[in-house]
UniProtKB/Swiss-Prot annotation:
One Gene Ontology term from the biological process aspect of the record: protein transport
Name of the protein: Protein Hikeshi
Family assignment from sequence similarity: Belongs to the OPI10 family.
Designated gene of the protein: hikeshi
Broad class of where this protein is predominantly found: cytoplasm
One GO CC annotation: cytosol
Amino acid sequence: MFGCLVAGRLVQTDAQQVASDKFVFNLPDYEHVNHVVVFLLGTVPFPEGLGGAVYLCVPGGAAGQVWQLLGFITNEKPSAIFRISGLKAGEGSSHPFGMMDAPAAPSMAQVGVSVEGLHLLAQQTPVSSSAVSTLDSFTQFTQKMLDSLFNFTSSFALSQSQMSPNPSEMFIPASSIRRWYENFQRRLMQNPNFWKT
């Protein structure tokens, strides 16, 4: 029913069924994995009104076994890419996997899929760092350009006591540049295409 893919590795389609509605993939050597893809194989769709919540369990940590919600897949969204490179043992969320045995090997993580109602999936909040960046190259370029302009202009900053009068030179307060920078960055984060209007 499910598949799991890590770049440079074979596709896993042998999910271990640990309950009637729960499936687990072992993820060896997870420390060297940046992203994981979980998908429906296309052979068996979810029953009407159901989808799959995708969790990650990494070994270790003071709390023992911790499952972190990555996101979900459905018949309408049959695959998803999750970034796991920044996720370590730590705070998890409530999860349906109970007190399953943690992976035996210290470098073995587990990806779990729990079949749940679509209404429940919509209410859950994934770990924020698991989402793949959606910033396009233009937005990234714009942010780098803003940083460069701000850093460049700041390198010429002088206090008023250091300035010598020069009628042909115009001075702009650094606070004005900083205010423009902060406003532009805020608007860019709210709507990367705001400049088109």
